[in-house]
């Protein structure tokens, strides 16, 4: 998913104005893809690399990583430390919005209505009846901190609750159990620069599956 996002953005940026490089990050493997297709390591001290014997530094990072470390503030904090500007929101906003339960509690403080939910941490158990009494069925059981729709299950029956919890724990140390909300799903993208704020048209999310996923 992350690589597809990167390739999409790469295809739209003007190559006459910018020297573009895709950097692949997987665990401790950080590599930049050179025009030849060869991959060379990134120096994590300053996010630089060497090409044809010449050291090259980045002027800007366009973050397209779905999940950690691209959406939870870790990569943003790293770029802040070494002084490289980047796309996406800052450390605080990234960390808070990546944690679904924390984000919902924050929104509640502003009087925004959110689905009823509960948090379950690894090592603790919960009875099926507790889930049903708290959020009802159907409900969504999902990793509390996770990208895209990995580990997410729409639970319709009591028998599906524990397998869904186990699946979600495979992606995160915390699981969020959330009441199902019937309605029209919409999304609205926006971005802010030094000079302006741009809000894109509201878009309805339509899927042939049980819920929008990858």
Where are the model-predicted features located?
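ATP-grasp fold ATP-binding core
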Residues: 107-108, 132-150, 173-182
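Phosphate-binding site of ATP-dependent enzymes
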Residues: 156-214
